[in-house]
Amino acid sequence: MSKYIGPDCRLCRREGMKLFLKGDRCYTEKCAFARRPYPPGQHGQERKKLSEYGMQLREKQKVKRIYGVLETQFRRYFEMAEKMKGIAGENLLSLLERRLDNVVYRLGFASSRGEARLLVSHAHFKVNGRTVNIPSYLVKVGDVIEVDERSKSKTRFVEIKEKYAKKPSPKWLEKDAENLVGKVIALPTREDIDMPIREHLIVELYSK
């Protein structure tokens, strides 16, 4: 499956909610969804009632877009979630939350998951003292995530420290905003997910 390279704002309009893919822009009047809260296209304002399958598919697409994951990898996460103890849907969300790019975003070390993915890919972060440039890297309890010392003086990280790093993070993470260091102190649970996600629909879709 190819990577989507179109405007991020079209994805928010397609899913009928803000996915916060553009960082600061999502909180301003420039947000395309705020101005046109309906699907893109000629007949976008004519919302159709979705079938059961349609709702399941839309929910899957929404979660994939929130976390920036393509189908093959998303399916792999679901298969992992099914093999874990507990509820498959909640396990799936926990795995997605544990992605390094998401953790960087949750710590406030990037304005969006998209930016976090880019910064991780460019080797600006270390995990337990070692450079990790794989956005899909799954963190575990005890892992320490930090901005590389050589990157801290870069203009973008100075801006990040001033604008985002001091914002609250989920309770499963702790951070030293001044030094741009974070630590995983617990695994994320369903209560830590702040987006309106109906994960049971995804489980139903993949269980057919």
Curated annotation (Swiss-Prot):
Keyword Ribonucleoprotein part of the UniProt annotation: yes
Protein's GO biological process: ribosomal small subunit biogenesis; translation
A single Gene Ontology CC term: small ribosomal subunit
Domain S4 RNA-binding: 98-160
Gene3D superfamilies, sorted: Ribosomal Protein S4 Delta 41, Chain A, domain 1, RNA-binding S4 domain
Example GO molecular function: rRNA binding
Presence of keyword rRNA-binding: yes
SUPFAM superfamilies documented for this protein: Alpha-L RNA-binding motif
Alphabetic keyword roster: Ribonucleoprotein, Ribosomal protein, RNA-binding, rRNA-binding
Domain of life from the UniProt record: Bacteria
Signal peptide extent: none
One Pfam family, short name: Ribosomal_S4
Quaternary data: Part of the 30S ribosomal subunit. Contacts protein S5. The interaction surface between S4 and S5 is involved in control of translational fidelity.
Record NCBIfam families: PRK05327.1, rpsD_bact
Family statement: Belongs to the universal ribosomal protein uS4 family.
Known function: One of the primary rRNA binding proteins, it binds directly to 16S rRNA where it nucleates assembly of the body of the 30S subunit.
Protein name per Swiss-Prot or TrEMBL: Small ribosomal subunit protein uS4
Source organism of the structure: Caldicellulosiruptor bescii (strain ATCC BAA-1888 / DSM 6725 / KCTC 15123 / Z-1320)
Gene name as annotated: rpsD
